[in-house]
Structures are given as structure tokens and as C-alpha cells.
Regions:
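Histidine-centered nuclease catalytic patch
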Residues: 22-54, 63-75
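A detector for short metal-coordination/catalytic motifs
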Residues: 50, 61-100
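Conserved phosphate-binding loops in nucleotide/dinucleotide-binding enzymes
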Residues: 58
């Protein structure tokens, strides 16, 4: 098995937590947020700024390796709002953390 590339810096994780202000999926603000891969590593995702969101313990455990939109539909979460916000956050943080 190939080694997983972990590109997310501590500064990027802090910025993600600040911008999302809680769980990216359900909005929960209590407790410590966990790093969740929108596209799971097992499905070809990367551990990088454009694929990580803060998630509460419950959402992170429930989503596991599921595809995000299907999982959100099953949980009756607002997938459209999540995807729109995900794009906004990616654009905002891409300019802040430009790579050379």
C-alpha cells in the first residue's frame, strides 16, 4: 500500500477551524473538532487543505468512509449549503495558503 501524503499544516488546520466555526456538516460548536476528509483517503482523497474539514465526533464517526453527499442525504443534512460553503472556504484559504 502506498504511503498517504499528509500535506495539512497546523496553520492550515487552525485556519479551517476558524473559518468553519464548528462542524462543517452539522454546525455543532461544542467539543473538539476532528479532521475529516471530504473525499475519504480510501476513495482517493488526500490529507490536504482542499479535502479536510472540521467535524464533530458524531459526524466524523458516522460519515466514516462514505461519499459525502449520499451520507448527508441519509442524515438529512443540507448538502447544498455544505457544498456552497466548501467552495467558498476553498477559494478563501487557497489565496491565503498559496503554494509555489
Amino acid at each position: 500500500m502506498d504511503a498517504v501524503e499528509h500535506d495539512l499544516s497546523d496553520a492550515q488546520w487552525s485556519a479551517l477551524q476558524a473559518v468553519w466555526s464548528g462542524c462543517a456538516y452539522c454546525g455543532e460548536t461544542d467539543g473538539t473538532m476532528q479532521r475529516d476528509c471530504v473525499l475519504p483517503l480510501s476513495r482517493g482523497g488526500r490529507y490536504a487543505l482542499d479535502n479536510i474539514v472540521p467535524a464533530c465526533r458524531s459526524c466524523n464517526a458516522s460519515k466514516c468512509n462514505h461519499e459525502v453527499t449520499g451520507w448527508m442525504r441519509r442524515k438529512k443534512l443540507d448538502e447544498r449549503a455544505f457544498l456552497n460553503r466548501l467552495i467558498e472556504v476553498r477559494v478563501m484559504l487557497a489565496s491565503q495558503f498559496e503554494t509555489s
